[in-house]
Design a protein with these regions (language model features):
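N-terminal export signals
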Residues: 1-17
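OB-fold and OB-like single-stranded nucleic-acid-recognition modules
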Residues: 15-160
Length: 160
């Protein structure tokens, strides 16, 4: 399905509720907004040898097709809340180390995920598939601001 959403295709809500639509990270950006228009030139933090991106108003623009959609997408876990059983909320990020070892991607490239079934803490470096209902919701966390929220119903290790 990746690419079809980016091209602006619309899907009937009834179809979204029956089967998860597999999406990729580029599908989070609304049609007609190139990624290059989200991230500005940024600045170099010479002291820490780190490039700090600058985002414009496009960084919070979300894909309207995804609001309320039942989706499946891959990503990496940045834990926010944990219990003795595992991670109960996290930021789903497009690459390992996002928000921790590198500056965070723009809000429309980050998903705040909650799950009723905790994800084991020993699998945090593995890519995962997350399936559930996606929504538009700006959430500020200690690691980054997210543009999407996802109520996870299913999670599994992403097999490369």
């Amino acid at each position: 399905m990746a690419g079809a959403l980016a091209a602006g295709a619309t899907l009937p809500r009834t179809a979204l509720a029956r089967q998860a639509i597999e999406i990729m990270w580029e599908d989070l950006i609304p049609p007609g907004v190139p990624y290059s228009e989200i991230i500005g030139e940024g600045v170099m933090d010479e002291r820490n040898d780190l490039w700090l991106p600058e985002f414009d108003e496009n960084a919070k623009k979300l894909n309207p097709v995804l609001d309320g959609a039942y989706i499946k997408m891959p990503g990496f876990i940045i834990p926010i809340e944990t219990s003795t059983e595992g991670v109960t909320s996290f930021v789903l990020v497009p690459y390992v180390g996002a928000c921790i070892h590198t500056p965070p991607p723009p809000p429309n490239q980050l998903v705040f995920v909650t799950t009723a079934t905790p994800w084991p803490g020993d699998d945090l470096w593995e890519a995962v598939w997350v399936t559930g209902k996606m929504g538009h919701e700006i959430t500020s966390t200690e690691v980054a601001e997210t543009g999407y929220a996802l109520a996870a119903e299913e999670m599994e290790i992403y097999i490369w």
